[in-house]
Design a protein with these regions (language model features):
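Flexible, low-hydrophobicity surface segments
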Residues: 1-108, 125, 133-136
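Alpha-helical support elements that line or immediately flank enzyme active sites
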Residues: 1-15, 49-69, 152-219
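General beta-strand structural signal in soluble alpha/beta enzymes
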Residues: 11-16, 42, 134-138, 164-166, ...
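Short, glycine-/Ser/Thr-/acidic-enriched flexible segments
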Residues: 17-19, 47, 55-57, 94-95, ...
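Short helix/loop capping segments that flank catalytic or ligand/cofactor-binding pockets
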Residues: 22-23, 58-61, 142-144, 173-175, ...
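Glycine-rich and small/hydrophobic secondary-structure elements
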Residues: 28-58, 200-249
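Short beta-strand elements
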Residues: 38, 152-157, 178, 242-251, ...
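Conserved beta-alpha junction segments in alpha/beta enzyme cores
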Residues: 121-182, 241
Length: 257
């Protein structure tokens, strides 16, 4: 492509470079490809990556990459995704990730990933004994934790070993996922976490490490990725949430349920 012939460009990574590995990862559900394969599912999902001698050369090469998109049906809210006629966002079988702790994944026809319930105590008795019952619905938007230090990683892949220097809060989980992704024994993956700075959960689990490693593998030399703040905002966020909560209490302030 035109990007590959730009000054300073060492490698351009696209989906065709991932055909020899299983490119999906995810700490709970393996639903994130290293780069988009057949579909782009959200704003900010990587479709390609460029390694160059300088950041400005890499950015210039990225502008030369042409992508033809076919517009598909969109579910841009929880309500739209749960509708009977909603487009299926993730097809195929759900696969648990390295930190999956939700029990067995159910067969599903729609966009619901998992249903979970827990009961403790006598809820009906608590409601009958309560002097006040408050039943409300709450909406929480997606948030970005906004640490001053953005996401960054240096990756080296020589074919036999992966070496990472990454701002990650879960290095052992990242190591396990990287070993699976690139089909290496776990002892062949080494991760060093320098001074992390702020994280607040936003640097939890695997984020940029697969992309940097795949690019380093193709470039056959170490690769560094340092996000800008706006790039970090689409790298990781806490999901938005709709929540219904019913609280039961006595007139003396004792919480019953």
């Amino acid at each position: 492509s035109a990007a590959e012939t730009m000054p300073g460009v060492v490698a351009v990574l696209t989906r065709k470079d991932l055909s020899d590995i299983d490119p999906y990862y995810g700490h709970a559900i393996q639903d994130r490809p290293i780069v988009a394969l057949e579909k782009v599912r959200f704003i900010g999902e990587p479709v390609a990556a460029v390694a160059a001698e300088t950041a400005s050369q890499a950015e210039a090469a990225m502008l030369q990459i042409q992508v033809d998109y076919e517009e598909l049906s969109v579910a841009a809210s929880l309500e739209a995704a749960l509708a009977v006629d909603a487009p299926i966002l993730h097809g195929g079988e759900l696969r648990p990730g390295a930190a999956h702790g939700l029990g067995d994944l159910p067969d599903r026809a729609g966009n619901v990933c998992y249903s979970y319930s827990i009961n403790r105590g006598d809820v009906d008795l608590a409601r009958e004994s309560a002097d006040i019952v408050i039943d409300r619905e709450y909406t929480f938007p997606a948030i970005y934790q906004y640490s001053m230090e953005t996401h960054s990683v240096i990756a080296q892949h020589d074919g036999e070993e992966i070496r990472l220097w990454a701002s990650c809060q879960h290095p052992f989980l990242v190591r396990a996922e990287m070993a699976k992704l690139f089909d290496l024994p776990i002892e062949r993956v080494r991760i060093t976490v320098p001074f992390l700075g702020g994280g607040f959960g936003g640097k939890s689990y695997t984020k940029m490490e697969p992309l940097a490693t795949a690019l380093a593998r193709k470039a056959e030399r170490p690769v560094k990725i340092v996000n800008r703040v706006d790039e970090s905002m689409v790298t990781t966020r806490r999901h938005n949430m709709n929540c219904r909560m019913r609280t039961m209490a006595t007139s003396k302030g004792e919480l019953l349920g």
